[in-house]
């Protein structure tokens, strides 16, 4: 039982680390696409680009931002699940009252 619990905890930790890494990567990509969309819009304003290209770039930037926000939620969920399983959020009855077992 102890090995199973340790293996589950290790897997949960790896998942939390991977989720955070994925979120950071998504955030960097979203920031880059937002800068690209800004430049594309500026080119259109100066008459050097087409509206369709500008709108497509803006759409991609918005989709990347949405993906980054979703990845951030996934990372936070993984982190808080890890904290919950580690009993870092609040004391369980057994932790607060050793020897007392609820009915």
Regions found by a protein language model. Name each.
Residues 81-103:
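Terminal intrinsically disordered/low-complexity segments used for targeting and assembly
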């Amino acid at each position: 039982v102890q090995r199973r619990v340790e293996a589950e905890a290790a897997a949960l930790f790896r998942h939390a680390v991977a989720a955070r890494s994925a979120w950071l990567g998504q955030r960097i990509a979203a920031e880059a696409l937002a800068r690209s969309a800004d430049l594309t819009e500026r080119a259109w304003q100066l008459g050097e680009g087409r509206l369709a290209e500008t709108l497509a770039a803006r759409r991609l930037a918005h989709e990347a931002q949405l993906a980054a926000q979703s990845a951030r939620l996934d990372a936070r969920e993984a982190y808080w699940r890890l904290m919950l399983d580690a009993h870092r959020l609040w004391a369980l009855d057994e932790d607060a009252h050793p020897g007392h077992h609820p009915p």
